[in-house]
Each structure stands twice: as C-alpha cells, then as structure tokens.
C-alpha cells in the first residue's frame, strides 16, 4: 500500500512536472513570439524612418539642382538676349547710316546728271571749234599756194628753193597754231575731266569712309608684376622654350617694366601666341602641359574670330552667299599687312568704291563690290602656296566657282593681263584710289629716295632741261628749262615727253604731276 502510494505520488509529480514544462514552453513560446514581433516592428519602423529621411534628402537635392539649373538657364538667356539686342542695335545703326548715305547719293546723282548735260554741250562746242580750225587750215593752205607762186616770180628762185622756204614757214606757223590750240583744248578738257572725276570720286567715297591703320610685326603683353617674368621663363627656361616652339613666335623679355614683346612676321601666329600668354598670365598656372591647353583654346578662339571677320565683311558689303571656306580665307586678310595697310580693310574700301563707281555708270553694283572684296584674296595664302597673290587669287576664285567677272578683276587688277569687263576696270581704279591716297601705304626710306632720284634723272636727261626738283613726296616733278633752247609753245611737248618717260620707267600706283617752267630774264648794266 505504502509502495503504491509513493509510486502514485511520483507519477503525479512527474505528470505535474511535465505539465508545468509544457505550460512553461507554451508560455515561453508566446512570450518569445511577442517580443520578437515587437523587435521586428521596431526595426521596420526604424527602416521606414531612414527611408523617409533618404527620400526627403533626395527631394531636397532635386529641388536644389532644379533651382541651380533655373538660375543658369536664366543667366544664359539674359546673356543671349543681351547679345541679340546688341547685334540688333548694330544692324539698325548700319541700316540707318546706309539710308542716310543713299539719300545723299540720290541728291548728288541729280547734280551729276546736270554736269553731264553741261559736258555734252561743251563737247559740241569743241567739235564746232575743230571744224572752224580745219576750215582755217584750208584757207591758210590756199594763201600759201598763192604766196608760193608770187615768190617764184618775184625772187627768181627755183621751185625747189621756194618749196623749202615755204615748207619751213608753213611748218613753223602750223606748229605754233596747233600747239596753241592743243594747249587751249587740253586745259578745257582737263578742267571738265577734273570736275567730273572729282564728282564721281566724291560721290563714291562719301558712301564709304574706312580707316586704314598700319600694324607692326610685334605685339606687347602686359603682366601684373616682374615676378611673372620668371614664371614665364620657368626652370632652366623650359616654359619660354615650350611657348616659342609651340607658337612659332619669339618672346622678347628685356628690362621693360611689366611687358613682354612677341615678335613674328606671321600676324596670325602672333595673335594666337598673345592670347595664349594672356590666358596663362591670368590663370597663374604656367607649365608645358598647361601651355599646350592654353594654345589649343587660343587657336580655336582665333579661328572663330577669323570666321567672324569674314562673315562681317560679306555682310556689310551685301554680296550675297559666299562659300564657307572662302569666308575663312577672307577673314585671314584681317591679319595680312601689305605696305603697312590692313588688306581686309583695304579690300572693303575697294569693294565700296568699286560698287559706287559701278552704280554711277549703270553697271552691276553688287557684282562690283564682290569683285572688289575678293581682288586681293590671294594674299591670305601667298605664304602657303607658290605663285603671286594674283595667280593664287585666280585659283581660289575658280575653285569656289566665282563668276567670270570676279576672276577677271582678280587677274587684271595689277595689269598682269588686259581686263575683259567693265567690272575689272572699276576694281583696278578703286584699288589704285585706295592704295595711292595719302597715308594709305608706307614705303621704306630707301625706296622713297630711289624713286625721287629716278624722277629727277629722267627729267634732267630731257633735251633743254636746266634742272629739276622732285617735290610733294614724289607726287610732283618741277622742271626748269633753258629759255634759249625751248620756246614757250614747246614746253608742253617737253612736259609730255617727260610724262611718257616716267610712265615707261617708273612703277607707281598714283599720279605724278609734271610741271615745266620757262623763265626769261633780261639783264643790262648801267654805267654811272
């Protein structure tokens, strides 16, 4: 009994223990699940909070980027609008000036027409005078024949002797009368031609008044201080050597304060080198790799500037469509100097003068401007290609299919060949006007002295000349003749002889005035 009791008691205890364990396990499981679920929810909440922060941060960044983009777009738009406004104002100013000049041109055209009518009437008077002179010559011949018969009868001369006397008297008398008539008509023709030529040129030049500025073979770059010179030279001169090798320009660094001189015969290379050096000085970082980067940037900038200059020249001359490559070649003329004259400005001046002259005589004004603008196009490449600038210009114009009148003007503007069109003649005249006007071009002192000496030599070699003087910078030669060798009416023949010899022996773009002076002095000594 007692054993059963303990057994039963043990079984119950074990059952209770098992039950307690099971209950504890269940309770532990639920507690574990509860706390684990709470931790998961906390982690999820933390993750959601972080996600919201990230989204908020991204939104803020996006808003900031949008604000910056809007600011940049607004700034760029303002710059573009300002640039457009400036260009529009420039175009409006040019059109306004052009309209005013056209008004003045129309008024002057009416005046010119009246002068032409007056010139026609003068021409009729000259023709009438010529007929009268021919009639007088016939009458003189009749009188001479009568005198011949009388001389043969009275002087008992042979016919040959009388003929010689009469021929000499007739020749002298006719020469005197013809020289007097030539002098009178020449003065009248010169007066009328001078008035008409001045009117034409004034009308043409009033439409265009361009400045020609001589340029040198050096450029000067200003630097902020003397220490910058050392940085430009670099360690053992590596920076300055790199600059000179890459740009092809000589850098001259001397004792001149805060300046560096760039020397080169090629103005385009010199301009690129100048911009490169200015960029390096402003940037402050000067070393070989930086020099290469600055050179690349400056080259692109100068190329763009050349294109802009070509486009501007084509625009202001209103010549129509031009091949893009020809535009670039035209822009290079801005950096080309001939006799200290900027070739692009010279070409613009020739274009406007040729155009106005063409309009005066009823020719194609636009075609004349186009031919004038391109007449020196070969000078842009004459240092890159073989041949004269005329030959190169003809090749370029033919390559880009310019009209035959333009090609003819290029080929004949230096009289290398005879002009085949009126346009070519007008371009040659405009070229002479532009290059020969005072101050347009400069020549060396040596050439200047040689030309003056040659003028005086030609004059002194003429028969009957006592002495001569070249004055007005070689634009006039004054000749004094011996009065006992040259008669009054023969000084015109002397002037013409000297003029023809000058035209034959001297090459000069312009007009040289020949003035012949004959002076007779009578001296008597009174004894007291």
Swiss-Prot record:
Q: Name one GO cellular component term.
A: plasma membrane
Keyword Nuclease found: yes
Going by the UniProt record, its keywords in alphabetical order are: Cell membrane, Endonuclease, Hydrolase, Membrane, Nuclease, RNA-binding, Transmembrane, Transmembrane helix
- Membrane-traversing stretches: 15-35
Class in the EC hierarchy, top level: hydrolase
Please name the PANTHER family in this protein's record.
Answer: RIBONUCLEASE Y
Q: What is the membrane topology listed in the Swiss-Prot or TrEMBL record?
A: Single-pass membrane protein
NCBIfam families from the entry? Answer: HDIG, RNase_Y
**What is the protein named?**
Ribonuclease Y
- Chief subcellular site? membrane
| E.C. designation(s) | 3.1.-.-
Q: Where in the cell is it found?
A: Cell membrane
